[in-house]
Amino acid sequence: MKKLTPIILSTLTFILGWHLFTLYSGIPNFILPSPLSVWARFLKAVNDGSLPYHTGITLLEIVLGLIVGVLFATVVGYILAKSRSLEKVLSPYLVASQAIPVIAIAPLLVIWLGDGILSKVVICALIVFFPVLVNTIVGVRAVPTALYDLMGSLHASRSQILWKVEVPASLPVFLGGLRIGATLSVIGAIVGELVSAEQGLGFLLQLGDFQYDTPMVFVAVFMLIALALMLYGIVRLLENRFLKWQNKP
């Protein structure tokens, strides 16, 4: 509870300052709504079912994109970590792919894959791929040589070395990449939805914009923040669960 106290206090201070600013600044509600207006719009969207539905669609896109991106990044990262020659061949292309903003190719992906959930999942996976890939390579290569020598002296099989040495030793770095990828996956889903979608939080953002329903825009933005924080928190829980040994004296 002590860890949450500063967060709660800072959040309440922000909301109070926001409310006072909208109350005395004279700015119209359609430009900057008050917290009470946003809360009322949130309750309305929850009651009519639109917010749970569209949030569920976006969350599904995020989770699927995260799974696909992490799986591909982990497999490719492990292969490149074990083969420096292959990394030298592929790394220029991988780096070049990161020089192209995903938002620039998102319209192409929507044209090729359609405006359904598939294009959003692919966009999510592309954004997640690189940070997890890099951390996988770094994590696997950070395994001490002495551990390989020890397992070799015990005549350990390749699978035993993988699961008993490489996975545990590289897990801290890998989870660090997953933390980044989890939050970036939210951006991926929204980029796809803003390009073309008839459902999801990105659709609600555009709908609120077109209808000058600014409180709805704020509701959608805060839901995206909540999703990002939730995913980040899940990864932190995984770190606490699997990396307990790091905190031991």
Segments the model singles out, each with a brief description of its role:
Residues R84, P172, G176, F218-P249:
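C-terminal transmembrane helix and the adjacent membrane-cytosol boundary/short C-terminal tail
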Residues I111, V140, I187-M223, W245-P249:
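Glycine-rich helix-loop "coupling/hinge" segments at transmembrane-helix boundaries
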Residues K2-G26:
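N-terminal signal-anchor transmembrane alpha helix
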Residues V95-P131, V138-G139:
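Generic hydrophobic transmembrane alpha-helix motif, especially the helices
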Residues V140-A146, L150-S170, F210:
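Short helix-to-coil transition segments within interhelical loops
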Residues L64-L94, I111:
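Transmembrane-helix boundary motif in ABC transporter permease subunits
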Residues Y24-I67:
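Periplasmic/extracellular loop-to-transmembrane helix junction in inner-membrane transport proteins
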Residues V122, L126, S159-G192:
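Transmembrane alpha-helices
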